Amino acid sequence: MLSPEILEYYERGGERERLTAGAGRLEFLRTWDVLTRTLPPAPARVLDVGGATGVYARPLAEAGHRVHVIDPVPEHVAAAGALDGVTAEVGDARDLPERDASADAALLLGPLYHLPDRADRVAAWREAARVVRPGGVVVGAVISRFASLIDGVAKGYFAEPGFVSIVDRALGDGVHRNDGSVRQWFTSAYFHHPDEPAAEALEAGLTGVRTVAVEGPVWMTGPRLTEFLADPRLTGVMLDMLRRIEDEPSVLGASGHLLTIARRHA
């Protein structure tokens, strides 16, 4: 279900701590903020497709939701299934082992940026639409087309010649291809232009589609971001400001990640 370099990246824990500090922590807080405003009230049945080790499944279960994780990595499934209130199984976002209209909401927070072919991404959206009830919500996360360019400057990756060609291709067709030889770079992925995820969701038959910026441009601020996140008051101010501009089209391309929210036709 996953290419060898992607599977190896996750098996060695490439994402295990990513959402705990810095820009990763901001990504988590903003994603959680959007979810709390988007998902139906608890107790709802939520399918967390590509939910990995349960970084979002855990707080969703703690909030009273019934959460089922479906992920292609067996180690992820074992970790998520060990969480209180969470069940998990191995599966593919393009062919979910779920009955029609069996969930209140479906999350695609991991699969879409590992499906380089548009047809596969639309299939994942279509499957998510199939398994939620009429009127149910689907939320999908993607990586911005320009994320590797920005990250390469912020982290100094452009000093290494191999990174230049990776970014050059990503800017051209969205495909970020890392064969795993340079481990500090993200594994192979697809980076969406801000216009693409909504178009894919619409093609899959979903309605009420909107795309919001997750981190906005704030993720580029480095040490200053860490200072904000260490202060609960400043964190609250930052989250409030980002919420106010999350729909601003001119901000979407500067955000590291985007969330697209849609519903199955009622």
Residue ranges and their predicted role:
Residues 1-42, 55, 59, 79, 137-170:
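Conserved class I S-adenosyl-L-methionine
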Residues 94-106:
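A short acidic, Gly/Pro-enriched loop at the edge of an enzyme's catalytic core
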Residues 115, 181-195:
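Acceptor-substrate binding/catalytic loop of class I
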Residues 200, 204-266:
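C-terminal lobe and adjacent flexible extensions of AdoMet/dcAdoMet transferase-like proteins
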